């Protein structure tokens, strides 16, 4: 009787255990931590070129001049750990120095920025185990569209948001408190939508929208929790500042970028495993229904 009761308690957990086992096997086989380390290295190499290209695009449109300042502050306040101010100062110095580069150097910056997008594309298709290859021209067109249209669309959305916030009817107390609540979850929503687009568009195979939404939601929640946990760790355990002094920002930035990519790739693994788990259950049911006829 006791064993039967325990079986009834464990039976709802069995799908979760099976899914967790499949997810762990996939993560181990794909070498998630090594892939995250590769992307972290490429990200640090491409960080300054990518930011330079993005804010050069904003500079080309006068309407985005004020928005670019707000966007920069928003990114470092919501997507970087506690040392975001220091990192922002260093990156602004690097970007200012890059303005004196020649045409050849500028082309090199663009190529290096595209390298990050190419690396993300390659790693995600490794996780999806896709053998389909895009043509070089098509791939370059997609990378260039992401590099150029992405920042412009973000800037346009912030222009619209600023316009809506300036309207007089939004000054009402109840509406104002509602806007505060929306702005509080805005970074989470941006992360969710960004991860969903990443998992849906980048792989060269068809990805079910529901799986991509679930994987993106888990990644977005982990990203928000990881950001707060990392900031707490840096504040409460300042070992890097004690050891490295002024240079502490370098290992802290690398750790944060590496941790971020671990979360992004974990969301991708969850998205893939959801499809595999569903296929496994469908196969098990078909075998069960056919066995009596045998």
UniProtKB/Swiss-Prot annotation:
Q: Name one GO cellular component term.
A: plasma membrane
Predominant location of this chain? membrane
What UniProt keywords are attached to this protein's entry?
Cell inner membrane, Cell membrane, Membrane, Transmembrane, Transmembrane helix
What residues form the membrane-spanning segments?
44-64, 67-87, 108-128, 136-156, 185-205, 212-232, 246-266
- Highest taxon above the source species: Bacteria
Q: Does the keyword Hydrolase apply?
A: no
* InterPro entries documented for this protein: UPF0761_bac, Virul_fac_BrkB
Membrane-topology descriptor: Multi-pass membrane protein
Check the UniProt entry and state the signal peptide residues, or none: none
Q: Tell me the compartments it is located in.
A: Cell inner membrane
Family membership, please give it.
Belongs to the UPF0761 family.
Name by which UniProt lists this protein: UPF0761 membrane protein YPO0028/y3801/YP_0029
- Which organism does this sequence originate in? Yersinia pestis
